[in-house]
């Protein structure tokens, strides 16, 4: 049997890269057939899947050299991605096929497991946000716009291969899925904002609570991203977030009205206004201060 090394770099633009015997240094075998004893190098930030006739038969998600042995039982090296990979392999590895030919067809897929950064987003239309302030009894819905960048990571390469990029012939690049992820992310913002609001976080304070927002988005997107595609949000950055001028003014007016309903605060506000008026009068050379004295508004 021959020996060859199949190694493909999973670049930031590539989610999946495939390498097969026909494009390797071993020319003694047939195209898309991996020789027994072949050595496959797996780099840091990569996962490796061996697919035979459209079925996943080997998984290596930790760096090092993997020796392909046709006589061994299917194996899973899950690395730091945990036992969920083994569970997924047990569930799908033996029963999911992708229309492979009856003949022997073997391919090596390299999955990018690094954080994929620089994914921009922006709300084309305002997103509802509930503003709650229990101190003043404020509970009102407003609309906000926001923009920024987020990053994601393929945390379950088996699910990503199975449900997203199965049997690509060359590379599956991020641009093939980015628009779909962005659309689903923007749809998830409203329920994620609801979770943030329940924590008592105001919309203006969200840039300081992006960790909580990323966690809330992962919860909302778990069915479509983590459980279906094996993808999770790593970070969610907010460059800016703002309500409309009308909504901001409405909040200020409601806050002011709530303050004035408090007798103590209302009295303090009146006293402050009187004090300001007296200071202005005292600075008036025409003697307006005497008018305040006559009305009993100047204290000694």
Q: For each predicted feature, which ranges?
A:
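Assembly-interface segments of oligomeric complexes
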Residues: 244-300
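N-terminal hydrophobic membrane-entry segments
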Residues: 1-245, 299
